């Protein structure tokens, strides 16, 4: 019975509440912090479980009244309402019981790179960047550009943005992968549709304690900053390139006002990339074991197609097609795709967990 799965959470919540009121525990800051954190993580389930068990109790009470001459009809109507509430709350609890992604509440580094398609790919990278920024603004997230390399005719060859806001990773983690665009470039005189692509990486911002880099494993090169067209923008060598020797990862930053700022920003991106690399290795291992349909950042996988002539946007992981590409891109309405992706992931996770 579903209710049986809830009692351990309620028992543990009550146990923690008792422990937190113990004067001996109150004097142990480390233990107090650990218990408070556990209580916060259990509280949503405990609160919902209490409501659920009360609904079950109300259902039984109303069932007992069905044969009553005066209250039978009223009990029948009440049972209908209670059953609807029970089903809705049960689904909510199932989602709460799913293992929480430890990165979900983190800020993210959004990296967009032009792929096949040359200048047109760079232009689309710019369009996608603008759409994501509109999405970030809709959700109340803050953002700052970490580094950028502009395309020859506009857009970006590469741009990295730090997006700050609670739950940023949980909303955008499914955006990682290859985004294909089909449209007629402005420079196309014959009206032919060209296909190009950009790759998107979503990397959680990591704390210094989460990933350590041996100073001997990196090489830091200082260069002259360059602006549009490659011209020098100052007289100091402030641009920084950091190479992580064991992996070959290279991060360059020149957007800060000083060498120190550029090095600090480059190190943050490097840590995020190394963390992402570790996550990809872990996910690859898990995926090989359970063949998950929805990836959470595989750069190699083609996840979405943007077809401008048809005003169509298709997400290939869940076979979702919407004919409102113009509105989604113009207003950053990515939740129209993200919500179905989250629902799909949750259903898949419930199936695996046997919930």
UniProtKB/Swiss-Prot annotation:
User: Is Protein biosynthesis there in the keyword field?
Assistant: yes
Disordered: annotated segments:
283-306
- GO CC annotation, single: cytoplasm
Record carries keyword Nucleus: no
Which SMART domains does UniProt cross-reference here?
PCRF
PTM remark:
Methylated by PrmC. Methylation increases the termination efficiency of RF1.
Localization per record: Cytoplasm
Give residue spans, biased composition: Basic and acidic residues: 283-292
State its role: Peptide chain release factor 1 directs the termination of translation in response to the peptide chain termination codons UAG and UAA.
The protein's name in its UniProt record: Peptide chain release factor 1
Origin species:
Campylobacter concisus (strain 13826)
């Amino acid at each position: 019975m579903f209710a049986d799965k809830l009692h351990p959470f309620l028992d543990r919540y009550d146990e923690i509440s008792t422990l937190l009121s113990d004067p001996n525990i109150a004097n142990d800051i480390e233990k107090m912090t650990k218990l408070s954190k556990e209580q916060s993580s259990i509280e949503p389930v405990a609160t919902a479980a209490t409501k659920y068990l009360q609904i079950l109790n109300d259902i039984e009470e109303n069932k007992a009244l069905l044969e009553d001459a005066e209250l039978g009809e009223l009990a029948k109507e009440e049972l209908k309402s209670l059953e609807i509430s029970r089903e809705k709350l049960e689904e909510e609890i199932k989602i709460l019981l799913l293992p929480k992604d430890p990165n979900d509440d983190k800020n993210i580094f959004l990296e967009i790179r032009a792929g096949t398609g040359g200048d047109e790919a760079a232009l689309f990278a710019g369009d996608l960047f603008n759409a994501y920024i509109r999405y970030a603004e809709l959700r109340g997230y803050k953002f700052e550009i970490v580094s950028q390399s502009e395309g020859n005719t506009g857009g970006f060859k590469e741009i990295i943005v730090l997006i700050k806001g609670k739950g940023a990773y949980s909303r955008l983690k499914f955006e990682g992968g290859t985004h294909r665009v089909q449209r007629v470039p402005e420079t196309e005189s014959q009206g032919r549709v060209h296909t190009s692509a950009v790759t998107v990486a979503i990397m959680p911002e990591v704390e210094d304690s989460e990933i350590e880099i041996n100073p001997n494993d990196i090489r830091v090169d200082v260069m002259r900053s360059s602006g549009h067209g490659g011209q020098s923008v100052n007289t100091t060598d402030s641009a920084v390139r950091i190479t992580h020797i064991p992996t070959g990862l290279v991060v360059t930053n020149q957007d800060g006002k000083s060498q120190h700022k550029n090095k600090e920003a480059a190190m943050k991106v490097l840590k995020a990339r190394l963390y992402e690399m570790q996550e990809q290795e872990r996910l690859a291992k898990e995926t090989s074991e359970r063949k998950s349909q929805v990836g959470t950042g595989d750069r190699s996988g083609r996840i979405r197609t943007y077809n401008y002539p048809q005003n169509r946007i298709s997400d290939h992981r869940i076979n979702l097609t919407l004919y409102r590409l113009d509105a989604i891109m113009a207003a950053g309405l990515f939740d129209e795709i993200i919500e179905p992706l989250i629902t799909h992931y949750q259903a898949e996770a419930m199936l695996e967990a046997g919930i």
